[in-house]
Amino acid sequence: MRKIIVGSRKSKLALTQTNWFIDQLKALGLPYEFEVKEIVTKGDVILDVTLSKVGGKGLFVKEIEHALLTKEIDMAVHSMKDMPAVLPDGLTIGCTPKRVDPRDAFISKNGESFKDLAEGAILGTSSLRRSAQLLAARPDLQVKWIRGNIDTRLRKLKDEDYDAIILATAGLQRMGWDGEVITEHLDETLCVPAVGQGALAIECREDDTDLLQLLAHINDAVTERTVAAERVFLHKLEGGCQVPIAGYATLKENDAIELTALVGSMDGSVLLKEIVVGIDPKQVGLEAADRLIKQGAKELILAANKEQQ
């Protein structure tokens, strides 16, 4: 019986996601056993700086990918939105389980909705994507950066001077907390989700054919196709956490993919948005990027990167 070593970050959410996925594999009843190896990433250690200032995408995966390449672990369970657009040579996303709710969750201290927040209220987020879109809708709000895991951010909302914070609905759902803490879900038209938000990425070595065959049992074809379109878009624009960039795809009738893609200025004064429909994920992602580039997306990305140096 093969033992599969599964790499995971140490946070409660990461371990919850990892153990959930292992349970899906165990339910297949195949001759494998599993062991979780906890790994600390750079993003877990640097908590006093915004994500955009410490290197963006890859902050929560690089150390885990190193463990995969050196064969300390056999596979890893990541949040798809933490994954860089390009993986290291030798690694692949072996499986994308069915995506859960991709929306952002708005949580206010006193139960007000986003539109009813007082003028000048303080909104906590560590995401340029969220801050740009929400400032576009409510330029009067003050954005204050907030870092830490879900528990830490909820505690900061209660104890510090934040009036509201934004978290991913998916994480709260996986922890079983969505019913008790979320004030409202932000509609995708108000706040386009991050590329891959709500989805998991199961990463492994591309030459591990035995494991790839096992992972194929849990793969969700719709999630795989829609997330692929989002990630092609992200790659073409070379976007990471340093840029207000969003991409969310759904599957429509007749198997068409509809991708809503967005790039914004840091302060939300400019939001460029395109909706592209097509069958091939790669073509949809590339077309969305090309259309936004024609609108001036590259200039916004350069300006955002410069602003943070």
Swiss-Prot record:
It catalyses: 4 porphobilinogen + H2O = hydroxymethylbilane + 4 NH4(+). The keyword Transferase applies. Tetrapolymerization of the monopyrrole PBG into the hydroxymethylbilane pre-uroporphyrinogen in several discrete steps. Pathway: Porphyrin-containing compound metabolism; protoporphyrin-IX biosynthesis; coproporphyrinogen-III from 5-aminolevulinate: step 2/4. The modification S-(dipyrrolylmethanemethyl)cysteine is found at C241. The porphobilinogen subunits are added to the dipyrromethane group. It comes from the Bacteria. GO terms for biological process: protoporphyrinogen IX biosynthetic process. It is an enzyme of class 2 (transferase). This is Porphobilinogen deaminase. One of its GO terms (cellular component) is cytoplasm. Monomer. Coiled coil: none annotated. Its EC number is 2.5.1.61. Its cofactor is dipyrromethane. PROSITE patterns: PORPHOBILINOGEN_DEAM. It comes from Bacillus mycoides (strain KBAB4) (Bacillus weihenstephanensis). One of its GO terms (molecular function) is hydroxymethylbilane synthase activity.
